[in-house]
Curated annotation (Swiss-Prot):
Keywords: Aminoacyl-tRNA synthetase, ATP-binding, Cytoplasm, Ligase, Nucleotide-binding, Protein biosynthesis
Organism: Escherichia coli (strain 55989 / EAEC)
Protein name from the UniProt record: Histidine--tRNA ligase
A Pfam family recorded for this sequence: HGTP_anticodon
Broad class of where this protein is predominantly found: cytoplasm
Length: 424
């Protein structure tokens, strides 16, 4: 007997019982995006490898350790996308969407990183990202954060996420801080773990978000990033904080907050939670004013964020169990008798025409009334429409409210109107 082929480790199947809650959450997110005037862009999951090396940085963990890279039959190096911003910028440049224009874009789909799989962190994972181009003031940074705050309210998780903010300044200011930080770390090299020693010269800002408690204790005496900010970045950050305060959005300034990708400048932010154990970040982003030019376009200010959907689903399920998936079926059409199936299918098609948006499932595979009502209950139907031989003969149907148990005989021409009233 042939051995069963299973999914690749860290790349998961999501079965119908799971995808239903995903669909409701995604629908909520998309509705909010639409209310802010953001437009969807759809991007390839495979890009040329140099795109990510140039955008993310060759000495980042993502590029050095985590990318799925391969050669195609022409010998070109291709990579499964580890994040969405680089591809979105590439598309904007390629299709002339960015220069001297304002764009508010969002995308959703799978990303790929070769990490150690654990709860909330997978090798294939799903992100929803937003990117705004052509606007450089702190007001658009604030709007993106306000948008995410509206998501949390809509999902019922506002009390379980907190906002952390920082400014990492201009590229020049960050270079000055980098030198000061490296000098400090060199003086205390014996207290660093091997990972931090490696990062000290390649990407020293990542030492700031080390998870090692001893390193974090050492960093209490390190130079503060805020002391090295240029004046424009200070003003930009102060403006952002003022806007968030006016909007009633609470935040904490975390001067050790940096992002793991090299393209960020000025604003960086994270929404974090204590409800998912070690995987605390739900949504993160910031400003990347130099990336468009870095990838071959003309200088264009930009800001954006990405959110891991697996973690968001876990969080919603953990803290808001009342946020349930929509039922698979609203109406279940029960048919019993030798000649009723054809009539039932015809009635079902008519009801789908007259009740757009209502989910109606017709029973197939026979079965007595008891079995069919059991199926209706399994699919979460609120109402059953019953056709037996006598109903077909006299042009009626029985409409049964599966919650109250009340049932009514209705002329088939009036079934849609009756259902509309019953379903509200």
């Amino acid at each position: 007997m042939a051995k069963n082929i299973q999914a690749i480790r860290g790349m998961n199947d999501y079965l119908p019982g799971e995808t239903a809650i995903w669909q409701r959450i995604e629908g909520t997110l998309k509705n909010v995006l639409g209310s802010y005037g953001y437009s969807e862009i759809r991007l390839p999951i495979v890009e040329q490898t140099p795109l990510f090396k140039r955008a993310i940085g060759e000495v980042t963990d993502v590029v050095e350790k985590e990318m799925y890279t391969f050669e195609d039959r022409n010998g070109d190096s291709l990579t499964l996308r580890p994040e969405g911003t680089a591809g979105c910028v590439r598309a904007g440049i390629e299709h002339g969407l960015l220069y001297n224009q304002e764009q508010r874009l969002w995308y959703i789909g799978p990303m790929f990183r070769h990490e150690r799989p654990q709860k909330g962190r997978y090798r294939q994972f799903h992100q929803l990202g937003c990117e705004v181009f052509g606007l450089q003031g702190p007001d658009i940074d604030a709007e993106l954060i306000m948008l995410t705050a509206r998501w949390w309210r809509a999902l019922g998780i506002s009390e379980h996420v907190t906002l952390e903010l920082n400014s990492i300044g201009s590229l020049e200011a960050r270079a000055n801080y980098r030198d000061a930080l490296v000098a400090f770390l060199e003086q205390h090299k014996e207290k660093l773990d091997e990972d931090c020693k490696r990062r000290m010269y390649t990407n020293p800002l990542r030492v700031l978000d080390s998870k090692n408690p001893e390193v974090q204790a050492l960093l209490n005496d390190a130079p503060a990033l805020g002391d090295y900010l240029d004046e424009e970045s200070r003003e930009h950050f102060a403006g952002l904080c003022k806007l968030l305060e006016s909007a009633g959005i609470a935040y904490t300034v975390n001067q050790r907050l940096v992002r793991g990708l090299d393209y960020y400048n000025r604003t960086v932010f994270e929404w974090v939670t204590n409800s998912l154990g070690s995987q605390g970040t739900v949504c993160a982003g910031g400003r990347y004013d130099g990336l468009v030019e870095q990838l071959g376009g003309r200088a264009t200010p930009a800001v954006g964020f990405a959110m891991g959907l697996e973690r968001l689903v876990l969080l919603v399920q953990a803290v808001n169990p009342e946020f349930k998936a929509d039922p698979v079926v609203d109406i279940y059409l029960v048919a019993s008798g030798a000649d009723t199936q054809s009539a039932a299918m015809a009635l079902a098609e008519r009801l789908r025409d007259e009740l757009p948006g209502v989910k109606l499932m017709t029973n197939h595979g026979g079965g007595n009334f008891k079995k069919q009502f059991t199926r209706a209950d399994k699919w979460g139907a609120r109402v059953a429409v019953v056709l037996g031989e006598s109903e077909v003969a006299n042009g009626t149907a029985v409409v049964k409210d599966l919650r109250s148990g009340e049932q009514t005989a209705v002329a088939q021409d009036s079934v849609a109107a009756h259902l509309r009233t019953l379903l509200g």
